[in-house]
A protein has these predicted regions:
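Ser/Thr/Pro/Gly-rich low-complexity, intrinsically disordered segments
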Residues: 1-3, 17
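Short, low-complexity intrinsically disordered segments enriched in A/P/G/S/L with frequent Arg
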Residues: 3, 10-12
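Intrinsic structural disorder/low-complexity segments
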Residues: 9, 16-19
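Nucleotide/pyrophosphate-binding catalytic subdomain
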Residues: 18-183
């Protein structure tokens, strides 16, 4: 597949056209990645939703990977420090993974309100398996069955970036820039 940028200056999103890399047989799959500034508020989420649905209307299967809104991750880190400056890495993973879940749910709700079939999935629901290196995990494998099943139902799939699950079923995060890795 190839990578293309749309937009001016620093791109608000990246589109990856995936062909056989994930084992999909059809050429119409487009994976779109949206960073935190592009989903920072309700208007921006609606704009992202329009971009996603426009791609879908053109006949493509769409998987969108979203980051947490704006400074959400930094805000969550600050809240954790207020409660426990020495919080365990596992508990930090639990907390930090929520930012992407919020963004994905809100985007799915916006797409749903526009009348399109959509489902949001966490990294682990999407089959992202990682090692146990908390806060800097690496993807060890991806089971794309759930994503493929949803695409086969003609749903738009919105996936949380930045996160997966390890062999102990603990949430892990991929570190800064992890949503790009997820895409």
């Amino acid at each position: 597949g190839g990578i293309g940028y749309q937009g001016g200056g620093c791109p608000p999103y990246i589109i990856h056209v995936i062909d056989s890399e994930w084992g999909y047989q059809h050429m119409g799959l487009i994976v779109q990645k949206f960073g935190g500034s592009s989903v920072a508020d309700a208007d921006k989420i609606r704009n992202v939703s329009r971009i996603i649905t426009e791609t879908y209307r053109r006949g493509h299967s769409v998987v969108a990977v979203l980051s947490a809104q704006g400074d959400t991750t930094d805000d969550l880190i600050e809240k954790a420090k207020e409660i426990n400056p020495n919080a365990s890495r596992r508990e930090m993973e639990m907390l930090l993974s929520t930012g992407e879940q919020i963004a994905c749910s809100l985007c799915a709700m916006a797409i749903e309100a526009m009348g399109y079939p959509v489902i949001s999935l966490t990294g682990w629901q999407a089959g992202m398996r990682t090692n146990s290196n908390y806060s800097n995990a690496r993807i060890s494998r991806i089971n794309t069955e759930r994503i493929q099943n949803e695409l086969d139902k003609k749903s738009i799939v919105i996936v949380t970036g930045f996160q997966g699950i390890n062999k102990y079923d603990d949430i892990t995060t991929l570190g800064r820039g992890g949503s790009d890795t997820s895409a």
